[in-house]
């Protein structure tokens, strides 16, 4: 049976050999299962420990029962349309993130299973000068769930002989789920979107120990601000 992608208390990288090709007879069921695994995380976030609201962003936390990696969640409401959010988050997710977040760089695609839907990307994350940059190799799955919502999930992928980050980087691990749905007013007209995000990270080495709850939640709020500013610059409102 296929393992729940996010069910463990710890981040569990998947082997590149376990990323099915679109021609595999089990591909459709494999893709559906990992999307459902991600949706379970989205549904759980309101039940996590509430850390308060900051700049219009509701923050949540779920610590592992014993040892492992803590999940952090955020929920925010936005007045931009679902169509505009698709341009910013659904398509070329990693490439766009490198455009609006200055800490993400050297993003490039390693594999394409289905273009703009299931891809493997590699990117680097800038760290303080006294640490080596972090390197991520991520499976990125981007799916329209229905006309009114979409989901993007990431989980780390390992390749044979890829334990090293190469150059001056250290391999790190990252799970994330982004869920965006259309918000409607009382008359059924679109009034923006709801953006729900869950992340957990293992930066590796001593670097992870520097990230307290406060540091990480500030980072989550910062990303919303950076994204909104970039979206408004790149896709300005008409009129």
From Swiss-Prot:
Subcellular location: Endoplasmic reticulum; Golgi apparatus
Keyword set, alphabetical order: Endoplasmic reticulum, Golgi apparatus
Endoplasmic reticulum keyword on record: yes
Protein name: Uncharacterized protein C577.11
Major site of localization recorded for this protein: endoplasmic reticulum
Domain of life from the UniProt record: Eukaryota
Pfam families cross-referenced by the UniProt entry: DUF3074
SUPFAM superfamilies according to UniProt: Bet v1-like
Cited PANTHER family: DUF3074 DOMAIN-CONTAINING PROTEIN, EXPRESSED PROTEIN
GO cellular component, one term: Golgi apparatus
């Amino acid at each position: 049976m296929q393992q729940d992608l996010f069910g463990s208390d710890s981040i569990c990288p998947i082997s590149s050999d376990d990323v099915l090709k679109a021609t595999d007879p089990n591909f459709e069921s494999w893709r559906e299962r990992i999307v459902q695994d991600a949706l379970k995380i989205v549904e759980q976030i309101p039940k996590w420990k509430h850390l308060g609201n900051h700049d219009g962003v509701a923050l949540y936390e779920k610590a592992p029962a014993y040892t492992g990696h803590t999940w952090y969640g955020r929920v925010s409401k936005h007045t931009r349309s679902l169509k505009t959010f698709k341009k910013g988050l659904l398509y070329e997710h990693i490439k766009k993130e490198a455009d609006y977040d200055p800490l993400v760089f050297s993003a490039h695609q390693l594999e394409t299973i289905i273009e703009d839907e299931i891809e493997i990307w590699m990117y680097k994350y800038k760290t303080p000068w006294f640490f080596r940059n972090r390197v991520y190799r991520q499976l990125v799955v981007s799916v329209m769930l229905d006309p009114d919502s979409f989901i993007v999930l990431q989980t780390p992928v390992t390749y044979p002989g890829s334990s090293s980050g190469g150059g001056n980087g250290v391999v790190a691990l990252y799970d994330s789920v982004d869920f965006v749905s259309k918000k409607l007013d009382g008359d059924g007209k679109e009034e923006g979107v709801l953006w729900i995000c869950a992340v957990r990270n293992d930066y590796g080495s001593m670097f992870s120990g520097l990230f307290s709850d406060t540091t990480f939640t500030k980072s989550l709020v910062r990303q919303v601000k950076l994204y909104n500013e970039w979206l408004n610059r790149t896709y300005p409102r008409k009129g």
